[in-house]
Amino acid sequence: MLQLARFYSLARTKAIHSHGAPFRPEYALKCGLEIHTQLNTKNKLFSQSTNSATSLVDAPNHHTSYYDIALPGTQPVLNLEAILFAMKLSLALGSQVNSISQFDRKHYFYGDQPQGYQLTQHYRPFARGGKINLSKELDDIDESAKEIGILQLQIEQDTGKSHYTETDKDVITLVDLNRSNVPLIELVTKPDFSDIKQVRAFIKKYQNLVRHLHISSGDLETGAMRVDVNLSINEYARVELKNLPNTSSIINAIKYEYQRQVELISVGDTSSLMEPETRGWTGSSTVKLRSKETTIDYRYMPDPELPYINLAPDVISGVRGLMPQLPDDIMRILMKKPYQLSLKDAKILTYNSNQNDMYNHEALRSYYLDTFREFSKLAGERSNAKLPTNWIIHEFLGDLNKLQIPLAKAKEILPPPVFAQFLKLLHEEVISATSGKMLLFHILESFKQSNCQDLSIPDFSKLIEKFELHAINQVDPQELMDLCNDVIAQHTDDTFIRNLVTGKKKSSLKFLIGQGMRRSQGRIKANEFEKKFKEILNIQW
């Protein structure tokens, strides 16, 4: 009987996944998020312990104080840096920062919560309201625009971590309090999400925002950002989803839970959807953790040891005046004249993945903008906006990643005015694009071979002469003809040539031009090859 039940459960899980969980209008999804974000303050929220919650190398209980382990007689001292970080995030979201907020005790007993309560802001949160705007243009959602409202933001302390070790006789619980008392911001959204794309876009945008503001690493994988989902269908009760370690888990859990509830509703088995419940994600399905009947009474009460947070209007306005330009505004500027970047390239300069040691988005954007200005001065009205984009974002970054040279180091030999001179050589066709790639890689490779110690600014003229990289202005007609014929001779497939000549596959011409450029080592320009190939093959289109 037990085996039969397991078989049925497994079959049902596979069936739900096979449906792909499409969202149907008759089963309207209503979804909201609760996001806990660890703040990367220097110290913890109520003690002088170093804040190193996401470090993977620290010994257990290394970053702890008497207060963090709840030694009797110790008292909390509020870290004002956490208040500043919370204010920056609130202002970036357009939230109303409350002039008075307070900390409350949330009582529960657990091994990794030594105080027996958590300090949070239940009655008077730090900020209310606000929103994040999503758009089809920037966020790849289906609607032209979608506003996700924010209910509130509150500051609270994180808990410790429990680690379980199995022995021959028992299971031992080990407690690490390095994370205990690390400052968190809990953000609660309104239930404004109606599909998966919106959820994914919101998480990515919020993640980038906290990184942009330098208040958190925003990493889901290390627990610096943790997301719970509140989900309901039509007017049925809310289900909370927990244990969601990354974006794919969040998306898959929503898909699974949506389809699970749709199946229950469609067969009339809605008794389990009448009361709120909490469910966990196992990696393939959601399982019930607790229902309303087992909901914990946290017995909230104002903390008697901490005074109110009282913020004067000039403090809030002062922080507002120090706020950086926000990512969406930056992207829209970059996508317009004079830069005219694609969305993909604009995101490279605006979104910080937090995973690239060679550069961060702010340093890269600053380098790009400075180089663009210098190049525009040199080239004047004839400047080509695509040159800085293609050569910095694609060629230059590609070389840095390949050679593992940090941008900060590369800037020492190729500062923006020097890189602008390099772009001018390409713009004036002193060297071809192929020669430019060879020259740029040689400069960076030589710098790498010196262990980034040779800070000599490259002399482009000498290097061009040394490697004979000058573009050929007077092309030898016979040499060009021979090169083109050699390239064509390599393609014995008549279909390839026929599709090219008839225009059925015009992209093949670019392939032939690329082959010719390689054979000439970039000395002969692409347009010369294009004209000669069209002449030889009698291409009329």
Swiss-Prot record:
Enzyme class at the top of the EC tree: ligase
Any single Gene Ontology cellular-component annotation: glutamyl-tRNA(Gln) amidotransferase complex
Catalytic function, reaction form: L-glutamyl-tRNA(Gln) + L-glutamine + ATP + H2O = L-glutaminyl-tRNA(Gln) + L-glutamate + ADP + phosphate + H(+)
GO process annotations (BP): glutaminyl-tRNAGln biosynthesis via transamidation; mitochondrial translation
Pfam families: GatB_N, GatB_Yqey
EC annotation from Swiss-Prot or TrEMBL: 6.3.5.-
Alphabetized SUPFAM superfamilies for the sequence: GatB/YqeY motif, Glutamine synthetase/guanido kinase
Keywords for the protein's UniProt record, in alphabetical order: ATP-binding, Ligase, Mitochondrion, Nucleotide-binding, Protein biosynthesis
Keyword Mitochondrion set for record: yes
Superkingdom field: Eukaryota
PANTHER family on file: GLUTAMYL-TRNA GLN AMIDOTRANSFERASE SUBUNIT B MITOCHONDRIAL AND PROKARYOTIC PET112-RELATED (PTHR11659), GLUTAMYL-TRNA(GLN) AMIDOTRANSFERASE SUBUNIT B, MITOCHONDRIAL (PTHR11659:SF0)
Sequence similarity: Belongs to the GatB/GatE family. GatB subfamily.
Role according to the record: Allows the formation of correctly charged Gln-tRNA(Gln) through the transamidation of misacylated Glu-tRNA(Gln) in the mitochondria. The reaction takes place in the presence of glutamine and ATP through an activated gamma-phospho-Glu-tRNA(Gln).
Misc. remarks from the entry: This protein may be expected to contain an N-terminal transit peptide but none has been predicted.
Name of the molecule in the record: Glutamyl-tRNA(Gln) amidotransferase subunit B, mitochondrial
Organism: Saccharomyces cerevisiae (strain YJM789) (Baker's yeast)
